């Protein structure tokens, strides 16, 4: 009976400890507006993902999305010569999830490993973007420019 009580306490302690660790190392983004996120990144475009695959970058697991791009709002350093992005597989590492064939506004940074999009960048389903912001980004050519 004592052994069962101790094992229950140990399992409870490990569960609480795991939650604390996950919460501590969870993705932590600065409080920025959509425009600030857009200006901070190397590329921003509107399009829909038509291909998804798992890939490994520097021994870490990533998801690779390739897009049909409808409109480019920002493309610093020709990042979009390849219309694909990679994002960390784990959402704790700021990875994002994109549904295939749904329009999204996608932004991120260009690295030697490719175009990286994370949760702290402006990555949002286009239908979830309020009309005011859609109007701004579509009609102001300098919306994403610093």
UniProtKB/Swiss-Prot annotation:
Subcellular location: Secreted
SUPFAM superfamilies per UniProt: TIMP-like
Expression tissues: Prismatic layer of shell (at protein level). Expressed primarily in the mantle with highest level in the mantle edge and lower level in the mantle pallium.
Domain of life, per lineage: Eukaryota
Residues in the signal sequence: 1-26
Keywords: Secreted, Signal
Main location (coarse class): secreted
Gene Ontology terms: cellular component: extracellular region
Name of the protein: Uncharacterized shell protein 6
Species in which this protein is naturally found: Margaritifera margaritifera
Lineage: Eukaryota, Metazoa, Spiralia, Lophotrochozoa, Mollusca
